[in-house]
Amino acid sequence: MLNLKTQQIQNQIPEKVLFNFQSATMKKLSILLMLFFFINILAGEKLGYALSGGGARGFAHIGVLKVLEEEGIHPDYIAGTSIGAVIGGLYAMGYSATELEEMCLKLKWNELTRDTHQRKDLYIGQKRWTPYGNAVFELNESWVPQLPSSVFVSNNLNLELFKLTASASQIQNFNELPVPFMCNATDLLTGEGVTFTEGSLMQAVRASISIPSLFEPFELNGHYYIDGGVSQNMPIDLLHKMGADKVLGIKVNSTLRDMERVNNLVEILDQTINIGITRNLKEH
């Protein structure tokens, strides 16, 4: 029998990974986990994890995965959106929750948005996904500079994802990963959700995490993709398509802000995205 007591879960989830989770939220989570997994173990059915998007809050996924691991619970399938695609993809590759936690604590997050690199120091494969400049300004037909497509240029983000997923670079079918995996993104031109089940894991994850206005849309095979959370932030449907009988959905996206917390560009962008995500979750 599982023994997922409220206090036990709160003690085991690392504070540095948990960020702004409130104790009330964790109490609800612990109760749901007890009920869900008690039924699931008795039934012996296939289990899938659905990891939502949620920006910085998304790293709370790692804390939840760590507790589940310690209870001997492992998924048969994983699907992720945005930051959930990053965590889910790496977990599907075989990284443990502890390894993911250590990785996140060591990573220099500020460097991901400071695109100061020397192109001559990059491998050929890395150059393929890295723009030539650190600040990109496009010109229109009249040779007039246009505003950039995003606040940040994602050179270093692309390179970091390239490094993290390098060991899976030869795997073209995500069902062949240690844990079968799917992630989703949104087609910028049609607004339709797109599911990635094969190809480059790095590209699939990068497409899913293209937060509008913060990172430029990711171009792949003539299509431009933005954050998967815009079309479906909780990829439960993907897991049912993979064959999961039971699904644990881990939702970590931000709640809507009040007026006192919508004061700058980033906060307004975050609020705008979360309005769409909140509406999307209600529809699904």
Where are these regions (language model features)?
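N-terminal processing/targeting junctions
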Residues: 8-10, 39-42, 74
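N-terminal secretory signal peptides that target proteins for export/translocation
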Residues: 1-26
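Sec-dependent N-terminal signal peptides
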Residues: 29-39
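Enrichment for repetitive, rod-forming helical segments
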Residues: 19, 34-35, 64
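General helical structural elements
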Residues: 12, 31-32, 61
